[in-house]
């Protein structure tokens, strides 16, 4: 079964909720990542020389880009059934930063926990599944571009 219109709608509405508190949700997202994978701190230039996760324009911009790419993946999955990367350099950047498969799992977990917080009372298994499928499509495309 393909990505449904309802799944796309769920991702879009929770993406809008995420954007309402970009600062807070960005900090939460990276805090969860670093709790699970402390060594990943060095992969992010905006976190390298900080104690903990400090809000910054770079942190917000990167978090917004990650979540927006997942949202765009939902749109693509609904329209065409596949995810085509808009940025051909993503694979090379991930290789350069030393990203490996377990990092994708950590980011997925952080993304879902952050969206759960952003969605509040609208959180559901259906919403979780929509974000999971969209993220998995994006991750698969990034991994493919890394090979």
UniProtKB/Swiss-Prot annotation:
GO terms for cellular component: cytoplasm; nucleus. Belongs to the plant globin family. Residues 2-147 form the Globin domain. InterPro entries: Globin, Globin-like_sf, Globin/Proto, Leghaemoglobin-like, Leghaemoglobin_Fe_BS. Its main location: cytoplasm. This is Leghemoglobin 8. Signal peptide: none annotated. The keyword Zinc does not apply. Disruption phenotype: Reduced nitrogenase activity in root nodules. Heme b binds at residues 45, 65, 94, 97. Pfam families: Globin. Root nodules. Coiled coil: none annotated. Induction: Locally down-regulated by cadmium (Cd), thus leading to nodule inactivation and impaired biological nitrogen fixation (BNF). CDD domains: class1-2_nsHbs_Lbs. The modification Nitrated tyrosine is found at residues 25, 30, 135. Monomer. Interacts with CAS31 in the cytoplasm; this interaction leads to its protection from denaturation under thermal and drought stresses. It is found in: Cytoplasm; Nucleus. It comes from Medicago truncatula. One of its GO terms (molecular function) is oxygen carrier activity. The modification Phosphoserine is found at residue 45. Keywords: Cytoplasm, Heme, Iron, Metal-binding, Nitration, Nitrogen fixation, Nucleus, Oxygen transport, Phosphoprotein, Transport. O2 binds at residue 62. The lineage of its organism: Eukaryota, Viridiplantae, Streptophyta, Embryophyta, Tracheophyta. Leghemoglobin that reversibly binds oxygen O(2) through a pentacoordinated heme iron. In root nodules, facilitates the diffusion of oxygen to the bacteroids while preventing the bacterial nitrogenase from being inactivated by buffering dioxygen, nitric oxide and carbon monoxide, and promoting the formation of reactive oxygen species (ROS, e.g. H(2)O(2)). This role is essential for symbiotic nitrogen fixation (SNF). Nitrated in effective nodules and particularly in hypoxic conditions; this mechanism may play a protective role in the symbiosis by buffering toxic peroxynitrite NO(2)(-). Nitration level decrease during nodule senescence. Phosphorylation at Ser-45 disrupts the molecular environment of its porphyrin ring oxygen binding pocket, thus leading to a reduced oxygen consumption and to the delivery of oxygen O(2) to symbiosomes.
């Amino acid at each position: 079964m393909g990505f449904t219109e309802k799944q796309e709608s769920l991702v879009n509405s929770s993406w809008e909720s995420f954007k309402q508190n970009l600062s807070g949700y960005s900090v939460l997202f990276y805090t969860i990542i670093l709790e699970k994978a402390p060594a990943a701190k060095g992969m992010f230039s905006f976190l390298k020389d900080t104690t903990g996760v400090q809000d910054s324009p770079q942190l917000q911009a990167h978090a917004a880009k990650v979540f927006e790419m997942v949202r765009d993946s939902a749109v693509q999955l609904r329209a065409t059934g596949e995810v085509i990367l808009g940025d051909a350099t993503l694979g090379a950047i991930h290789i350069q930063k030393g990203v490996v498969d377990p990092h994708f799992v950590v980011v997925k977990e952080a993304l879902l926990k952050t969206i759960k917080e952003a969605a509040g009372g609208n959180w559901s298994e259906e919403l979780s599944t929509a974000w999971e499928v969209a993220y998995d499509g994006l991750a698969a495309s990034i991994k493919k571009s890394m090979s």
